[in-house]
């Protein structure tokens, strides 16, 4: 049976399908984890330890010896995405109450949802697009983009902008697994190869356990809003990253558009932040549902936008004559 191939036909399927299965279990049999307990219960409710292993393995994929072009590209896209999310968060905080919007089309929307949905890029999608287009050096920026996975960067964003405070112990506890992974991955490339293979394999496990914090009612309620947010992510972050890629990273903008998505791992961020700061607890569930929808939407739209921009740039290059000093005289 081609179970994996079938799941991957759904955009972000290895994250979204287990998430929905977990939500189904929590909706129709909410006491399952307590009933079985033991290893089964831990598999259902163990989001944080599973996420800790994921962050460690992501850290192990980072190569400190990346070329200058790859480093410039990766850092530009990384800081650009985080900076844009921070800016939107600061603006949104002026209008959205701490417990989120309670009525109307935007019911359930919170500053947490906005920052988390904008803050993380689907690194796997970016890597696939760049490799498909034959952009090997641009693909190398994946290592930097992947550092957005997990709650740490979102915690930093909230802390730096003053939107929320986290104890230094919490920040340290979040980043230590990542740093340990970085160190081991650079000390031994065999360990990097070993742990890098774990990254995609562990995603369904924390997605399933995370799904057990949701229910179908909230997922259905956030549907249209989640679609709107997903479209906004592609348009807003795609435009800003396109400009940064062209004028800072000295690229043609295509890689920037390819980074205009929401990572599947972002679905875990509201829960993790609520565990670290109880003020996020009232909006964590609705934020998770919005982000889950955005993951699907951006997984569909980001490739279309990337291909469209790449096509337009190639057409422009074909129409532009070479400089006179490069023209040959017969």
UniProtKB/Swiss-Prot annotation:
Induction: Induced by galacturonate and negatively regulated by the KdgR repressor. Is subject to catabolite repression by glucose involving the ccpA gene. Its main location: membrane. InterPro entries: 2keto-3dGluconate_permease (IPR004684), 2keto-3dGluconate_permease_sub (IPR018395). Keywords: Cell membrane, Membrane, Sugar transport, Symport, Transmembrane, Transmembrane helix, Transport. One of its GO terms (molecular function) is 2-keto-3-deoxygluconate:proton symporter activity. GO terms for cellular component: plasma membrane. It is found in: Cell membrane. It is a multi-pass membrane protein. The keyword Zinc does not apply. Disulfide bonds: none annotated. The chain crosses the membrane at residues 10-30, 42-62, 77-97, 100-120, 140-160, 163-183, 200-220, 224-244, 254-274, 289-309. It comes from the Bacteria. It catalyses: 2-dehydro-3-deoxy-D-gluconate(in) + H(+)(in) = 2-dehydro-3-deoxy-D-gluconate(out) + H(+)(out). NCBIfam families: kdgT. HAMAP family: KdgT (MF_00070). Belongs to the KdgT transporter family. Catalyzes the proton-dependent uptake of 2-keto-3-deoxygluconate (KDG) into the cell. This is 2-keto-3-deoxygluconate permease. It comes from Bacillus subtilis (strain 168).
